[in-house]
């Protein structure tokens, strides 16, 4: 009787483990993601984005989060990058070099001549490794009008 009870309990536990959903491991985790909007008295606007992202997998490092994309229109907007660096797992800091800021035409505007004035800043994050944290702080300032 005790043996049968033991087997039924073990079978129930195993079935529960199969049926209950499991939490998948994260590719990356945001430690901080802040988007703030400021409307100034002269009518200009500032959108500031601050993010800290820790990478846990090679897929996150090489494909998903290895680059950040910022779309803006230089005819009436200004992009200001306040800070961009990577803190490696051992604590050392790798500043983003100047050649890691690449300005391109957004892919959505490729076949639309009316939108060829748009720009996309591609920030290529350097010094990435498993456990590294990306820090990016930038503003897009829109002129009044």
Task: Label each residue range with its predicted role.
Residues 9-19:
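Bacterial N-terminal signal peptides
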Residues 23-145:
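Beta-strand-rich, non-transmembrane domain signature
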